[in-house]
Amino acid sequence: MSEIYFSVKTPLNIEVRITAQYWQYLITIKHPIMKGREEIIKSVLQMPDEIRQSKIDTNVFLYYKRLDKLYCVVVKHADVEGFIITAYITDKVKEGVLVWTK
């Protein structure tokens, strides 16, 4: 099992983590633009502008925050824990059920 790279608590009281191995996959294969943006991802998770629940998978939540750009961190929830599926810069908030807003 890969070591935890970082872990943060969200406003939904979910402890979200990402492993070092998955982080490398995310920044080399999925979204290289996110390299070096760990603190931004933590901020999006800890203090999002809004959180939406996926219409397709009710265990998947999209955390949004506008900083220099609009960031989205996609998290799979499992009880009180969660793990990052992906993180990216987007131009707009996607559809989904609004479950939390600041």
Tell me what each language-model feature is:
Residues 1-102:
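Ribonuclease/tRNase effector modules and their secretory precursors
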